[in-house]
Amino acid sequence: HNLPMINGVPQKFGSEYKATDVVLDKKKKQLSMNIATAYPDNAEVEKWIRTYRLRDSSLDISDDFILKKLKNENQVNFLLWGDIDLNTAGKVKISVEGQIVELHYDKSLFTPSLETILLTDPRLSNVWGEKIFRLSLTAKKMVEKGRYVFSVKAL
């Protein structure tokens, strides 16, 4: 799904693993939450604040984090649908029925990869078709404290 692999560890399943410190600011058109609490202890994450901010021409997504220990590269994931173009470093072009958006990321921080996910569940395939894609942005450097910024813009 759309949550990061922190220190190489995925979000844990179960009601005790959930975001905390959720704040909705309607004036700023912003939603933020600490997703560190959605991960098991072996992720070694002290804080990971995911923020979504709606602007006039974009949706900005940022991750501000502090790790307790470095174990593995962080990987930020986005599930995508449509025609995907990774040919320009720092930009992912997504086209669906004549509508085009770009997801911008810092090419100096991440290496992109794309995985095809076949949908066999009719509840999903009836909506999304036979496949979706997982864009994985793998951090080039392991850092204990940092900020990742992504922006989605319509063209």
Language model: regions and residue ranges:
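CBM-like, beta-strand-rich accessory domains located in the C-terminal region of large
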Residues: 1-155
